[in-house]
């Protein structure tokens, strides 16, 4: 396998990449309008989803839904290898009209239950599906779809065994959840600081550490994705 390849069409955006000396500054916090399945294949780092830190081990899988902010805090000391696939919900509509395969992405709070490890799966079949998607094929789209669907089914089965545990949320997590619940409201630093009894400097510090974005950048990114989703669904965002 080469150190880099991409496949893109109307429904799928898939890539494999290896950086011998990763540059942490190149990996910025971002969101997507699509669903993402990310596989960490090698390196050293922490993946952060909506402020939740996930220390990584080779073979870890993470899932993110549209507008779920994420980035990797990568160490430059080791080569960084990863595989990711982004896909639209339309890809699954005719196959899975009840949304079973998207349940792990949707039926949870932001920044929770993003990480899947070997112990979460009943068998090692999921590894085969990942390997197959990264192999050369005369019809890459067919190869991707015929392996993505059973992989999503394995993740869905693993998700059903997970139990919701009440966790005392950190301040940054509470603020992130508050912003997402009120993303259409008149949000400002003053409003957030008044609600959580903190100074603007403290808010900006903990928020940037958790998300790699400023509060304003985060709100803008979320609103842009929400507006695009409304437009795609035929609804005016105003």
Task: Identify the residue ranges that each predicted region occupies.
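All-alpha amphipathic helical-bundle segments outside canonical DNA-binding/catalytic cores
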Residues: 133-150, 169
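Short, conserved beta-strand element in jelly-roll/cupin
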Residues: 30-47
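Terminal helix-turn-helix DNA-binding modules in bacterial transcription factors
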Residues: 177, 181, 186, 190, ...
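Short hydrophobic/aromatic patch on the recognition helix
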Residues: 59, 202-203, 207
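Short acidic-glycine-tyrosine-enriched beta hairpin
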Residues: 51-65
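The alpha-helix within a helix-turn-helix
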Residues: 193
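A hydrophobic/aromatic-rich effector-binding and dimerization subdomain
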Residues: 1-21, 66-135, 152-157
């Amino acid at each position: 396998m080469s150190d880099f390849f991409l496949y893109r069409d109307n429904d799928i955006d898939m890539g494999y990449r290896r950086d011998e000396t990763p540059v942490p500054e190149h990996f910025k916090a971002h969101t997507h309008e699509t669903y993402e399945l990310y596989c960490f294949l090698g390196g050293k780092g922490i993946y952060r989803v909506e402020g939740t830190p996930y220390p990584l081990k080779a073979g870890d899988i993470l899932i993110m839904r549209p507008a779920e902010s994420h980035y990797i805090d990568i160490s430059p000391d080791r080569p960084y290898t990863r595989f990711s696939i982004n896909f639209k919900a339309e890809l699954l509509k005719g196959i899975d009209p009840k949304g079973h395969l998207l349940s792990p992405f949707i039926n949870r709070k932001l920044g929770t239950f993003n990480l899947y490890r070997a112990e979460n799966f009943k068998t090692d079949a999921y590894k085969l599906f990942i390997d197959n998607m990264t192999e050369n094929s005369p019809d890459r789209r067919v190869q991707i779809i015929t392996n993505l669907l059973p992989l999503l089914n394995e993740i869905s089965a693993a998700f059903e065994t997970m139990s919701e545990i009440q966790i005392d949320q950190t301040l940054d997590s509470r603020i992130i959840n508050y912003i997402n619940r009120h993303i259409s409201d008149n949000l400002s630093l003053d409003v957030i600081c008044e609600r959580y009894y903190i100074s603007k400097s403290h808010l900006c510090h903990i928020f940037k550490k958790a998300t790699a974005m400023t509060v304003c950048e985060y709100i803008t990114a979320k609103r842009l994705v929400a507006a695009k989703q409304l437009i795609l669904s035929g609804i005016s965002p105003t």
